[in-house]
């Protein structure tokens, strides 16, 4: 008797299987039940340096393992991990990140070089967003020297200009694209920093390597620029292929309380 019923049972099972599959939800809502077509195009992300038909310019370096790190020949190294991976059974991909706050395009807070400011809480969260956002002048610096008082005077930066991005030989040499830290980068000498403080209305200084201060005047220049807590330093900017002139600058650091520096995303709008 059972032998006669076996074929009928198998037939019934085969008929019910499609219904069961249709009623069973996908293992993950991000993936459809239907297998992907072999002819389906795989989407490719678009990497852009300009947006809005060239009106919005990204002047932030993207983070990579071989970007320069302060006084290191090995670059930043691995800074991103994926401890939770959908490929390994997690419900979502979740990355972790660890890197120095003064790496890539970043901002300095007064506590970077003043211990009493650091202790008092003059951190990244205390920076004035109005200073970090507004009209800015992009200038080309003479390529033969660091930024001295004489050079600052020769630039003839008008009074009233509050934000200046200094493009230097660092951009021509593509130093931010080299893994090895280079002490010969162009930056402010102490007298150039003092001239800026004494003779201009500049409240934001941007430059195209990891420090606004020349390596030989590293701390003295920082002290001059950050002493009064009214100047913000943005370092490691990507300024190639941009015409000098006036732009609308928008920079937003991470809101890090207790940190004297932070990665920052900066754009220019024509």
UniProtKB/Swiss-Prot annotation:
<feature type="signal peptide">
    <location>
        <begin position="1"/>
        <end position="23"/>
    </location>
</feature>
<dbReference type="GO" id="GO:0004061">
    <property type="term" value="F:arylformamidase activity"/>
</dbReference>
<keyword id="KW-0346">Stress response</keyword>
<comment type="function">
    <text>May be involved in response to stresses.</text>
</comment>
<keyword id="KW-0732">Signal</keyword>
<dbReference type="Pfam" id="PF04199">
    <property type="entry name" value="Cyclase"/>
</dbReference>
<dbReference type="InterPro" id="IPR037175">
    <property type="entry name" value="KFase_sf"/>
</dbReference>
<comment type="similarity">
    <text>Belongs to the Cyclase 1 superfamily.</text>
</comment>
<dbReference type="GO" id="GO:0019441">
    <property type="term" value="P:L-tryptophan catabolic process to kynurenine"/>
</dbReference>
<dbReference type="GO" id="GO:0005576">
    <property type="term" value="C:extracellular region"/>
</dbReference>
<keyword id="KW-0964">Secreted</keyword>
<keyword id="KW-0272">Extracellular matrix</keyword>
<dbReference type="InterPro" id="IPR007325">
    <property type="entry name" value="KFase/CYL"/>
</dbReference>
<protein>
    <recommendedName>
        <fullName>Cyclase-like protein 3</fullName>
    </recommendedName>
</protein>
